[in-house]
Amino acid sequence: MISIAFYKGKKVALFGLGKSGLATAQALISGGADVVAWDDNPSGVQAAHRENIPARNLQYENWSEFVALILAPGVPLTYPQPHWVVDKARQANIEIIGDIELFVRARNHFLQQYGFCDEDVPFIAITGTNGKSTTTALLAHLLEQMGYDVQMGGNIGTAILTLKPFVKKRIYVIECSSFQIDLAPSLQPTIGLLLNLTPDHIDRHGSFAHYVNAKKNLVTGASQAFISVDDAACQVLYRQLLHEGHHVEAVSKEHFVENGFYADGTQLFSVCQGRRHMLADLASMAALRGSHNAQNALMALATLQALKITDPHMNKHLASYQGLAHRMQQVRKMGSVLFINDSKATNAEASAPALAAFNNIFWIVGGQAKEAGIVSLRGFFHKIRKAYLIGAAAEEFAGVIGSSFPFSMSLTLENAVHEAAVDAMRCKAKEVVVLFSPACASYDQFKNYEVRGEAFISFVMQLKET
């Protein structure tokens, strides 16, 4: 655990008692803070009591006694309207921050205390609309394979303050969501990665411009930034940072760049003043299939280069990466049919890489639709043999598909798996794919995308060989 000592003897309000909230409370308490925690969900309050964390309804506390509100990233800060606890903190004129900010301040204190520089305890922060978890996991994997002391956490699922404490040469690889960045005003990573920017979480940010601005804060604060230049918003941001004198390099999975990193098919290159150097070839790596994974690998390799880390066995290290659960995860193969779990694809842009990577697709899609639905995926419709529509979005998606290809109103995931398996087994193509890439949030039928993905795996494993 990373203990937070700079609130020692001071009273701190904490709201949000999920896994990261509980960990944050323990980190504050271990550092001597007087913590009062609360959550609108009774199960969170019960969890706090089980861990001996003081939990009282913050609506009835004297807010003039608090010096800060530590807020869970899932709690509305601004849009669609501030949560009542945010209003309370603003009325009391106290700072509102999250666990990433606590980590940043604790690291800064450690560096100052021991006279270390930024590079002595590298902090790599990774963000983007899609792909950030894979890039985070891949980078941490490569560092581990090469024998480095690495800690991985943040939005990827491991609460950042549960990581091992700071020591010299320990490397922190941290995934950051836009909500977490909003709550981290001092965020200044050693290296900042921005993978892509497409509309997402607009209900929480109010507009795409506000969403972009949140992501921008991560790379503008970085000592060294790498920005993908394959979408319009990132291109604008890259040029802006370059003009402002930031140390920033371009990364592209689609085209050559004069200075930076790019992919030519499965081959990855670094480029300096127009001269290129081959870094790796992903051709035989199943877990890194698709152009989106070329981008993820480029970002990881760019980071290693910035850290001045080289290894002659890089292809071997890349090949040993097994991929993330629920992200283009091969669950089973029955004859020529692959069953792919891509439950983490919670919007159309996140589904695009899987649709691009495969052919002869029997597509299970649907859930709670995001803005614009699957309209942006029309360019992949020629690859789809049939779709199986589930959840609240089924009727909307049926309208978008129209007569482009056959579809079934399966409604439930269990129905969809059985129907898709039967149809796919009849297909005579060399490789056939039952692809569960919902392009939707899970909340209409499942608690989260992980539970949804586990349900898919369970249904697939129950299928009987024919």
From Swiss-Prot:
Entry annotated with the keyword Ligase: yes
Keyword Hydrolase recorded: no
Organism domain of life: Bacteria
Pathway: Cell wall biogenesis; peptidoglycan biosynthesis
EC identifiers of the protein: 6.3.2.9
Primary site of residence: cytoplasm
InterPro entries, A to Z: Folylpolyglutamate_synth_CS, Mur-like_cat_sf, Mur_ligase_C_dom_sf, Mur_ligase_cen, MurD
Cellular compartment(s): Cytoplasm
Keyword terms, alphabetized: ATP-binding, Cell cycle, Cell division, Cell shape, Cell wall biogenesis/degradation, Cytoplasm, Ligase, Nucleotide-binding, Peptidoglycan synthesis
GO molecular function: ATP binding; tetrahydrofolylpolyglutamate synthase activity; UDP-N-acetylmuramoylalanine-D-glutamate ligase activity
Top enzyme class: ligase
Catalytic activity of the protein: UDP-N-acetyl-alpha-D-muramoyl-L-alanine + D-glutamate + ATP = UDP-N-acetyl-alpha-D-muramoyl-L-alanyl-D-glutamate + ADP + phosphate + H(+)
Described purpose of this protein according to its UniProt entry: Cell wall formation. Catalyzes the addition of glutamate to the nucleotide precursor UDP-N-acetylmuramoyl-L-alanine (UMA).
Family named by the database record: Belongs to the MurCDEF family.
Name the record gives this protein: UDP-N-acetylmuramoylalanine--D-glutamate ligase
Organism, scientific name: Bartonella henselae (strain ATCC 49882 / DSM 28221 / CCUG 30454 / Houston 1) (Rochalimaea henselae)
Gene from which the chain derives: murD
